From Swiss-Prot:
The keyword Flavoprotein does not apply. Important in genetic recombination, DNA repair, and replication. Possesses pairing and strand-transfer activity. Interacts with dda and gene 32 proteins. One of its GO terms (molecular function) is ATP binding. It comes from the Viruses. GO terms for biological process: DNA recombination; DNA repair; DNA replication. This is Recombination and repair protein.
Length: 16
């Protein structure tokens, strides 16, 4: 897991 991956997940969950 990398910072970019976590950021992507957070954005996806935020926009969900």
């Amino acid at each position: 897991m990398s910072i970019a991956d976590l950021k992507s997940r957070l954005i996806k969950a935020s926009t969900s």
